Amino acid sequence: MAYTSHLSSKTGLHFGRLSLRSLTAYAPNLMLWGGASMLGLFVFTEGWPKFQDTLYKKIPLLGPTLEDHTPPEDKPN
């Protein structure tokens, strides 16, 4: 029987208190909240012209719905 003076165990991969096991347990919840926050961002920035020109008009299904088909005589100055 050999005597060892210290505990021979290895620690798992971790960053602070966050381990790989806890990340995999929280992954579905984090994906749900991330997707919901992205949808909220899309809803609240839909009316901003800067976002329409740079982002929304480049999405294939959403782009044609944002084009302005108003005749020039009906537009304000």
UniProtKB/Swiss-Prot annotation:
GO terms for biological process: aerobic respiration; cellular respiration; mitochondrial electron transport, ubiquinol to cytochrome c; proton transmembrane transport. It comes from the Eukaryota. Belongs to the UQCR11/QCR10 family. Signal peptide: none annotated. Its main location: mitochondrion. The keyword Transmembrane applies. Pfam families: QCR10. Residues 46-77 are mitochondrial intermembrane. Keywords: Electron transport, Membrane, Mitochondrion, Mitochondrion inner membrane, Respiratory chain, Transmembrane, Transmembrane helix, Transport. Component of the ubiquinol-cytochrome c oxidoreductase (cytochrome b-c1 complex, complex III, CIII), a multisubunit enzyme composed of 10 subunits. The complex is composed of 3 respiratory subunits cytochrome b (COB), cytochrome c1 (CYT1) and Rieske protein (RIP1), 2 core protein subunits COR1 and QCR2, and 5 low-molecular weight protein subunits QCR6, QCR7, QCR8, QCR9 and QCR10. It is a single-pass membrane protein. It comes from Saccharomyces cerevisiae (strain ATCC 204508 / S288c) (Baker's yeast). The chain crosses the membrane at residues 22-45. The keyword Transmembrane applies. One of its GO terms (cellular component) is mitochondrion. It is found in: Mitochondrion inner membrane. Residues 2-21 are mitochondrial matrix. Present with 5590 molecules/cell in log phase SD medium. Component of the ubiquinol-cytochrome c oxidoreductase, a multisubunit transmembrane complex that is part of the mitochondrial electron transport chain which drives oxidative phosphorylation. This is Cytochrome b-c1 complex subunit 10, mitochondrial.
